[in-house]
């Protein structure tokens, strides 16, 4: 069935987005001096936190859709 494959692809995408945002957040927090191109570090940290939160919400939605699909079988 193609539906679960599409949802799994979306899940993989959102998981990668979360990982990228978490890595960016860690870089800002652990080495703010090395991020010279971003004068508004607080704004960048807030943006990264929002990106992590958004990705986690989408991951939960994908997981819920996969669970619903399993119950239909």
Model-based region annotation:
Residues 2-73:
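Extended, charge-rich alpha-helical interface modules
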């Amino acid at each position: 069935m193609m539906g679960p494959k599409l949802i799994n692809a979306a899940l993989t995408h959102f998981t990668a987005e979360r990982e990228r945002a978490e890595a960016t957040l860690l870089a800002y927090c652990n080495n703010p001096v090395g991020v010279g191109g971003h004068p508004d570090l607080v704004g960048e940290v807030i943006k990264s936190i929002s990106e992590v939160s958004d990705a986690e919400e989408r991951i939960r939605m994908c997981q819920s859709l996969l669970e619903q699909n399993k119950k239909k079988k």
